[in-house]
Amino acid sequence: MAKKGNRIQVILECTEHKTSGVPGTSRYITTKNKKNTPDRLEIKKFNPILKRVTVHKEIK
């Protein structure tokens, strides 16, 4: 039987969008290796609704 992989799919959500009051959310889907990065990801990505680069954090 095949071994389960270390790569999992995670969802990144904008943290600044909640406080701005603008409707909608900015989310990205990516993969991460849970052995190399066991803690939650925090990456700067482009938010098309706010039209600027913001911090996106991993959600569960």
From Swiss-Prot:
Gene Ontology annotations of biological process type: translation
Ribonucleoprotein listed as a keyword: yes
GO CC terms, sorted: cytoplasm; ribonucleoprotein complex; ribosome
Similarity annotation: Belongs to the bacterial ribosomal protein bL33 family.
The protein, known as: Large ribosomal subunit protein bL33
Single Gene Ontology MF annotation: structural constituent of ribosome
Keywords recorded for this protein, A-Z: Ribonucleoprotein, Ribosomal protein
Record gene name: rpmG
Database matches in PANTHER family: 50S RIBOSOMAL PROTEIN L33, CHLOROPLASTIC, LARGE RIBOSOMAL SUBUNIT PROTEIN BL33C
Pfam families: Ribosomal_L33 (PF00471)
InterPro entries, per the entry: Ribosomal_bL33, Ribosomal_bL33_sf, Ribosomal_zn-bd
